[in-house]
């Protein structure tokens, strides 16, 4: 069987892997699934570039789900591309497993497309997800720990996330903290920072 779904959302602040991206962001996406195969794209507003133009993040991803020793797993590739020189492009190979009581997502190989004569930089990422409860004030509560390593950037992030159905969609709250090596949209900003976001998303 196959399916095609679309999604739209808004968040009061856009943080990804413990790094600040934008004060607020509107996003749209589409996902196609057929058996164990998946393919999707996601587009988000990431604010102004160095040339003061509206900039977009455009993600494209594909992969396969499978069982590894009886554990649901996936292997995929993903690219992050930006308009108006907001950032250089990222391309990565990802692998993850879901054990029920915990799951993990990892970037087993990442390539940052540096420009202007600079060498490209390899990077890695690991995220551990632990569901805490699915009955917290009508929603689900979870914890995650993640780390990112690439070039001169090395940092870890802790996050608590809550989600619940509301207003015809899903409301999400994230409270996180990154360590001293955290990086933001501006060099050396948003390090050792506690942050919170409120989001709403719809799937149709």
Mark where each language-model region is.
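Outer-membrane beta-barrel proteins
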Residues: 1-204
């Amino acid at each position: 069987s196959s399916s095609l779904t679309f999604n739209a959302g808004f968040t009061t602040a856009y943080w990804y892997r413990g790094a600040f991206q934008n004060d607020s962001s509107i996003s749209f996406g589409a996902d196609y699934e057929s058996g164990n195969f998946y393919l999707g794209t996601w587009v988000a507003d990431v604010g102004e570039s160095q040339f003061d133009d509206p900039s977009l993040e455009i993600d494209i991803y594909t992969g396969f789900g499978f069982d590894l020793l009886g554990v649901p797993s996936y292997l995929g590739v993903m690219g992050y591309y930006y308009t108006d020189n907001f950032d250089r492009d990222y391309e990565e190979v990802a692998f993850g497993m879901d054990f029920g009581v915990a799951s993990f997502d990892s970037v087993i190989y990442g390539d940052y497309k540096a420009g202007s004569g600079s060498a490209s930089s390899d990077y890695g990422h690991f995220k551990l997800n632990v569901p805490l409860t699915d009955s917290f004030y009508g929603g689900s509560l979870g914890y995650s720990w993640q780390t990112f390593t690439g070039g001169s950037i090395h940092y870890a992030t802790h996050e608590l996330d809550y989600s619940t159905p509301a207003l015809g969609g899903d409301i999400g709250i994230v409270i996180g903290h990154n360590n001293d090596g955290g990086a933001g949209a501006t060099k050396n900003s948003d390090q050792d920072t506690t942050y919170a976001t409120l989001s709403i998303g719809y799937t149709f």
